[in-house]
């Protein structure tokens, strides 16, 4: 049930490959099955972060299994390596969602 939303002002040529790779990373970092990771990307977004230099905002949501202090570096490094975005132009938001507020297959997890 981890969900990652990637919004970037950069152009991403192979979105499917990037989504597959970031799904594997999130699965590994949360210790959740890759089959439950949902990933979304929006590239070429209008994002202003002091200027128009390429930047990226990532939203990561999950029922537990989030450790922002340990996850921030590998996720930032991934974005930098795959999209060429400088580390200082990457924001990441982590949200631990209560099981009672997350549904799948017609019912909530808690």
Question: Where do the language-model regions lie?
Answer:
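Interaction-mediating elements
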Residues: 1-110
């Amino acid at each position: 049930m981890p969900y990652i939303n990637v919004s970037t002002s950069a152009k991403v040529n192979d979105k499917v490959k990037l989504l597959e790779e970031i799904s594997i990373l999130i699965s590994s970092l949360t210790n959740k099955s890759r089959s439950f990771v949902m990933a979304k990307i929006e590239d070429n977004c209008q994002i202003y972060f002091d200027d128009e230099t390429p930047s990226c905002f990532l939203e990561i949501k999950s029922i537990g299994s989030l450790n922002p202090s340990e996850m921030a570096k590998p996720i930032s490094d991934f974005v930098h390596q795959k999209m060429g975005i400088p580390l200082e132009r990457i924001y990441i938001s982590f949200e631990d969602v209560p099981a009672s507020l997350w549904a799948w297959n017609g019912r909530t997890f808690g």
